[in-house]
């Protein structure tokens, strides 16, 4: 049987803090605190990384990585990196 602890949601982002907050709230509302949420920030300048740092302190099932730039990596590369940090057998793209 699959448990919520077996699931990670991965989400790359660039300057999309409003959507990240919405998706975080949606996952937590519907899945509780057990699924892991993994975010990759692609050199944002809208406060995304600061929010991610704060969430990593508050939520033990939240992980984030950051592209320090200045060149963007893009979603494809970031999805690959997110799959690497997701430590569950099931990974959902969000």
Task: Annotate the PLM regions.
Residues 53-73:
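Conserved donor nucleotide-binding strand/loop of the catalytic core
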Residues 41-50:
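A conserved acidic beta->alpha catalytic loop
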Residues 1-26:
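N-proximal low-complexity "stem/linker" segments adjacent to membrane-targeting elements
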Residues 8-10, 36-38, 63:
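A structural signal for isolated positions on well-ordered beta-strands in alpha/beta enzyme cores
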Residues 94:
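Catalytic metal- and UDP-sugar-binding loop of GT-A-like glycosyltransferases, i.e.
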Residues 68-86:
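Glycine-rich, basic loop-to-helix element that forms the pyrophosphate-binding segment
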Residues 25-34:
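Short, acidic, metal-binding catalytic loop of nucleotide-sugar glycosyltransferases
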Residues 91:
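Short aromatic/hydrophobic "clamp" motif used to bind/position activated sugar donors
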């Amino acid at each position: 049987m699959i448990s919520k602890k077996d699931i990670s949601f991965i989400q790359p982002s660039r300057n999309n803090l409003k959507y990240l907050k919405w998706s975080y709230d949606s996952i937590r509302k519907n899945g509780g605190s057990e699924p892991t949420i993994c975010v990759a920030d692609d050199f944002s300048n809208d406060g995304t990384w600061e929010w991610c740092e704060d969430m990593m302190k508050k939520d033990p099932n939240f992980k984030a990585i950051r592209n320090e730039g200045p060149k963007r990596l893009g979603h494809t590369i970031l999805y690959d990196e997110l799959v690497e940090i997701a430590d569950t057998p099931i990974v959902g793209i969000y």
